[in-house]
C-alpha cells in the first residue's frame, strides 16, 4: 500500500506500533515523501525517541488521543487491525485490507476533521 501511494498516507497506531513501524516503514515513507506524498501519523507519544525524531523528518506526527490501528492510502485503500496490539500476540494479529474509495474517503475525512480541529496533546 505505502509503496504505491501517490497523494497521501495516514497511519493511526499505538505507541509500541509506532516504534515497530519506524524501523520497518522508514525507508518506504522516506521514498513516498520524496514523491510528494503527504504523510500524517497519529500515535500516543509519551517520550520523543530517536525513532520518532527520524519519522518526523518525513511525516507530520500528532497525538490525537485515538485508540486505533489503521492506515489509509490516497483515500482509496484502508488497512485496519481488529485488536489493540497490547491485547494480542503478534503472530495472531489480524488485519483487513480494503480497496474501497467510498469507505477510505469517509474514514479519511473523519481523520482529517480530528487532525485539523482537535487540540494536539504533544
Regions found by a protein language model. Give the residues of each.
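Secondary-structure "cap/kink" motif recognition
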Residues: 1-8
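Short beta-strands and strand-loop turn motifs
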Residues: 11-13
